[in-house]
Amino acid sequence: MQPALAPHPSAQDHADQVLHDQLLAAQHQHLTHPQQARPQPPAPQPPHMQPNTPARDQNNIDPAISGATMLTGPPQTPTQPDVTGQETPKTYGKRPLSTSKRAAQNRAAQRAFRQRKEAHIRELEGKVKAYENMGEAIKALQAENYQLREYIINLQSRLLDSQGEVPELPGNIDLSQPRSEIPVPPIPNSGTTTTAAPPPTAPQQPQPPHAQAPTSNDDMNSLNRIAVAGLGMRKPPTEEANYLGNNFQAQARRVRPDEGQTEASELPKQEQTHGLPLIS
């Protein structure tokens, strides 16, 4: 076994010498050509020279070791830096684009949300203003309605005072009896004496006004009740009816004293039962 291993050191020395020569040549080439950006690496050259060395000593080198070195060693060293150098700019280029797009989308979504929110708020504010205006208009209409109702009641009272006639009522109220005026007899002179006895109906003439007044009061009360019910006043109908009835009664009282005076002035002149002249 020892004589077979004797030429192995000489082969290694020869390979080392070849590598040394190649390194010197590479350094000399680098010095002579300084303008090149990247000098040729000396590492890939030994694998090209390796097939010459094993050709000489194929019997001395283990095939398992030589196969592992030939398959695994050379292809890994040159490919790794190229792959990393090509992938790094792609990964760095994609990340800023994705983040910028996402940020732009977020800003656009926030802007659209703010616009929708502002539009909805403006719409609600417009509705609130419209409702406030409607409420004010309704209040003004209510106040005007109350004023018109009071004005109508005052007009009715004045019409009744000026005309003295009751307007037509529904069929459930009977007002078919006409109002008859009281006949006023002529006033005799004071110088002449009246010996004739008065007619038997003279003392009964003052009674029709007193009998007619309650009927007119009843008619006015019924008219007031119907008017208040038709208008739908907020006040109770009894208060309005009493108010109008009291006004009518007060006006009737203002008229009645004059009628009483005329009647009182006329009665002594007509009632002469004893047949003696009256001394004025």
From Swiss-Prot:
Protein location = Nucleus
The record ties this protein, via Gene3D superfamilies, to: 1.20.5.170
Q: Which Pfam families match?
A: bZIP_1
An example GO CC term for this entry is:
RNA polymerase II transcription regulator complex
Q: Where is the composition biased (Polar residues)?
A: 79-89
Question: Molecular function terms in GO for this entry?
Answer: DNA-binding transcription activator activity, RNA polymerase II-specific; transcription cis-regulatory region binding
| Region feature (Disordered) | 1-102, 169-280
Functional summary from the UniProt entry? Putative transcription factor.
Protein name, per record: Putative transcription factor kapC
